[in-house]
């Protein structure tokens, strides 16, 4: 059987590595500061590689050139490996997503998270959106606005197969874990489903 891949992508400092660790019950390497990790963290279970990609987007203290290089690397990685990627998990910070997205839209730009969501939907067969840091927001209001900004008509509950409210730091990831596992089982990737303990 050919190797398949599940990728985790998201802006710097959204809790991507923390979510990765919460789902798979082990610690992954993290940069000393957000945005400093340039290499993907990967591990393989059976025929599936699980990859935590570097965080993208502007990071205070780094040049825009550096941020663009990281984003370009992430996009190139996804395009290069698109044939083997069976699912992608985009992690957003639910507590700051709306503010950041609205700021970028006021400047006439497509927010990076929205651009990435659209890109992942174009190149990967299944996208899971992990709305992290839910302990810091009003669930319903924020999730409805997040869904709408990503092109999904509220209420967000209609999109439970896409949007997963999580709090990775507290280990509150059960719905995402369950559905990722079920999705892999539906693809006959039983060996990889063992990754979710």
Swiss-Prot record:
Listed cofactors: Mg(2+)
The name this protein goes by in its record: Probable GTP-binding protein EngB
Chain residues that bind GTP: 10-17, 35-39, 52-55, 132-135, 166-168
Alphabetized PANTHER family for the sequence: ENGB-TYPE G DOMAIN-CONTAINING PROTEIN, MSS1/TRME-RELATED GTP-BINDING PROTEIN
GO terms for biological process, alphabetical: cell division
Domain (EngB-type G) ranges: 2-186
A Pfam family it matches: MMR_HSR1
InterPro entries referenced in this protein's UniProt entry, alphabetically: G_ENGB_dom, GTP-bd, GTP-bd_ribosome_bio_YsxC, P-loop_NTPase
Entry function: Necessary for normal cell division and for the maintenance of normal septation.
Family of the protein in this entry: Belongs to the TRAFAC class TrmE-Era-EngA-EngB-Septin-like GTPase superfamily. EngB GTPase family.
Binding residue positions for Mg(2+): 17, 37
UniProt keyword list: Cell cycle, Cell division, GTP-binding, Magnesium, Metal-binding, Nucleotide-binding, Septation
Lineage: Archaea, Methanobacteriati, Methanobacteriota, Archaeoglobi, Archaeoglobales
GO molecular function, one term: GTP binding
């Amino acid at each position: 059987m050919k190797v398949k891949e599940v990728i985790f992508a998201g802006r710097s400092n959204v809790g991507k590595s923390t979510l990765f660790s919460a789902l798979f019950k082990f610690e992954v390497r993290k940069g000393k500061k957000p945005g400093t990790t340039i290499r993907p963290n990967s591990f393989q279970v059976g025929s599936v590689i699980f990859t935590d990609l570097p965080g993208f987007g502007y990071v205070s203290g780094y040049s825009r050139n550096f941020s663009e290089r990281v984003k370009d690397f992430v996009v190139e990685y996804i395009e290069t490996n698109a044939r083997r990627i069976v699912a992608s998990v985009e992690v957003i910070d639910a507590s700051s997503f709306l503010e950041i997205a609205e700021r970028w839209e006021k400047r006439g730009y497509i927010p990076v998270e929205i651009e990435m969501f659209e890109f992942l939907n174009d190149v990967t067969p299944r996208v899971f959106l992990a709305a992290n840091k839910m302990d810091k927001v009003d669930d319903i209001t924020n999730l409805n606005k997040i869904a709408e900004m990503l092109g999904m008509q509220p209420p967000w509950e209609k999109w439970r197969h896409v949007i997963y409210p999580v709090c990775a730091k507290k280990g509150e990831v059960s719905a995402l874990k369950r559905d990722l596992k079920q999705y892999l089982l539906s693809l006959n990737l039983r060996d990889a489903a063992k990754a979710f303990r």
